Design a protein with these regions (language model features):
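Bacterial N-terminal signal peptides that target proteins for export
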Residues: 1-14
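Sec/Tat signal peptide C-region and signal peptidase I cleavage site
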Residues: 20-28
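Hinge/capping helix and adjacent helix->loop/strand transition within the periplasmic-binding protein
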Residues: 29, 33, 104-112, 118, ...
Length: 325
């Protein structure tokens, strides 16, 4: 009886060990994927949530999660540290990271583009009664140039410089995200703010729809030529169309820059291929969350819109679809 009990125990131990080994294999196959996005008042976060949802539903053994962050600069640092596998970023911030410039002087970040996604439009926002009609009128005013972890600050500084202003001497500068900037301008704590994002940005829509306030967008497309001369051909002159936000009755002449979804240098070709293929072919599911995803198109996958190289896995998919990449 004792011998049989020992045999049974041994058999159970073997079965249990085999079960643990099998569980380990299953666990190893499960991939978690952190996606750096932005603040809850912007466009990166809802789009990132939609991207995470599509990838989790469409790719076997993948669990993707959209992370709230400070924006492009924070996202690129998360990529550098290995805390995020993918991230949204503006092209200018990505180039700075790749080259170890500006906010990335502590070290270059190895980056590869997965997808060119949509253009970010610079908003220079104020309200009636602020005395601000042109960029020159920002002199002496209280102005938010974006949060420290976002790329709004990067581009805002360049727009201000190209407009002939000094960001440190010519204005009282705050460093607020878009939602915080909207609250501050409502409370009359600031006179204007910079925000670079998709159309519409929820927080800006909230300001435009606020009773008793008339939001104004300041033209600044004249800064594009000087910015490109100094920083490379990253920016284009564009417009925020009349009606894009409640109460806006004329086009706003602006500077814009393209957004990318990027990864570091660790993602396999197979994973990159599967991710890009899924995002392009499931675009309609993402558009249902935010219309800027309309730009997740093959026509936009050109090197001129991405200053960093495309991942080989992405290029494989583009080539299959007749796009050079």
């Amino acid at each position: 009886m004792l011998r049989r009990t020992k045999r049974t125990a041994a058999a159970l131990a073997i079965t249990f060990s085999a079960g643990l080994a099998l569980a380990g294999v299953v666990q190893a196959q499960q991939k978690t994927m952190s996606i750096g996005t932005g603040g809850t008042g912007g466009v990166y976060y809802p789009l990132g949530g939609a991207v995470a949802n599509v990838l989790s539903k469409s790719l076997p053994n993948v669990q993707a999660t959209a992370e709230v962050t400070g924006g492009s600069v924070d996202n690129l640092k998360l990529i550098a540290s290995g805390q995020s596998e993918m991230a949204f970023t503006m092209a200018d911030a990505a180039l700075d990271a790749l080259q170890g410039q500006d906010k990335f002087k502590s070290g270059k970040v190895p980056l590869q583009a997965l997808l060119v996604v949509y253009p970010n439009r610079m908003h220079v926002v104020t309200v009636e009664g602020s005395g601000i009609e042109t960029m020159a009128d920002l002199k002496g005013k209280r102005v938010s140039t974006g949060s420290p972890g976002g790329a709004t600050e990067v581009m805002a500084f360049r727009v201000i410089e190209a407009a002939g202003l000094d960001k440190d001497k010519d204005m009282k500068r705050e460093r607020l995200g878009v939602a915080e900037s909207v609250n501050a301008i409502k409370d009359r704590k600031i006179d204007a703010f910079f925000w670079v994002g998709g159309i519409p940005t929820a927080a800006v829509t909230d300001l435009a729809a606020t009773p008793g306030m008339k939001m104004k967008l300041i033209d600044h497309s004249e800064t594009v030529e000087k910015m490109n001369a100094k920083y490379g051909k990253l920016y284009t002159a564009s417009k925020i169309k009349a009606g894009a936000y409640p109460g806006t009755d004329k086009d706003n002449a602006i500077a814009e820059v393209w957004n990318l979804i990027v990864t570091g240098d660790k993602m396999s070709n197979d994973d990159a291929y599967a991710i890009v293929k899924t995002l392009v072919e499931k675009k309609a599911d993402i558009v249902a969350v935010h219309k800027e995803a309309e730009s997740f198109s093959l026509d936009n996958q050109i090197q001129e819109r991405s200053p960093i190289p495309f991942h080989p896995g992405a290029l494989k998919y583009f080539k299959e679809k007749g796009i050079g990449g």
